[in-house]
């Protein structure tokens, strides 16, 4: 459960492999705060964390679990380099050698349909394409959990469909995805369970948790 300056009160959130959770609610309801707590970017006043059946302290969770979680802001945080260099950035901190990194980037660009844009300056592209670049940069690192804060708020219909397809592929590969949005319809066909955050608490819709939680 989480609590943060009375924005969130006794919130329980369970993450499952290959499942997508949608968090809806009004602006200021605490959706982003909850995501940042899960990502380890904000520390709650109180928290109970269980991972693979074991209880962990906040310090151990930060050290052992959160490296498997990627949080993406509403606005894609891309630097002034090519699409390819943006996608490759995170691999610099892995054990892969230069050849392996190059091969991984080529496969990731093919996976996301961005091969033809590989040499284009990423920050000159439309918001929808920039978000796909951000998704690809996350995907190449193979996190267990992907946290997305209003990922489709600045996209047209075509861009949303392209982004939703990438998210479906991530989920099919076993990734756990948590999304905040005030427009749940954007994620039809992707979401497994939806929560509405109101007055600091989550109201859960029906969900059959057939898989083991993380």
Regions found by a protein language model. Name each.
Residues 47-58, 65:
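Conserved ABC transporter NBD signature motif
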Residues 76-85:
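Conserved catalytic motifs of ABC-family nucleotide-binding domains
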Residues 99-117:
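Conserved ABC ATPase "signature" region
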Residues 121-125, 129:
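Conserved ABC ATPase signature
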Residues 135:
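Hydrophobic anchor residue at the start of the ABC signature
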């Amino acid at each position: 459960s989480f609590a943060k300056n009375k924005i969130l009160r006794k919130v329980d959130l369970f993450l499952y492999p290959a499942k997508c959770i949608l968090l809806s609610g009004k602006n200021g309801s605490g959706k982003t705060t909850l995501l940042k707590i899960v990502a380890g970017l904000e520390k709650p006043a109180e928290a109970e964390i269980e991972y693979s059946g074991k209880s962990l302290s906040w310090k151990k969770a930060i050290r052992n679990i959160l490296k498997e979680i990627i949080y993406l802001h509403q606005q894609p945080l891309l630097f002034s380099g090519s699409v390819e260099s943006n996608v490759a950035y995170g691999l610099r901190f892995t054990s892969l050698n230069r050849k392996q990194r190059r091969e991984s980037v080529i496969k990731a660009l093919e996976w996301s349909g961005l091969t033809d844009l590989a040499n284009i300056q990423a920050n000159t592209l439309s918001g929808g394409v920039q978000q796909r670049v951000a998704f690809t940069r996350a995907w190449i690192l193979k996190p267990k959990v992907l946290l997305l804060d209003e990922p489709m708020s600045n996209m047209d219909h075509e861009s949303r469909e392209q982004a939703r397809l990438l998210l479906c592929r991530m989920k099919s590969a076993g990734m756990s995805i948590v999304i905040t949005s005030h427009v749940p319809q954007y994620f039809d066909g992707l979401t497994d369970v939806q929560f509405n955050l109101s007055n600091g608490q989550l109201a859960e819709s029906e969900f059959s948790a057939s898989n083991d939680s993380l």
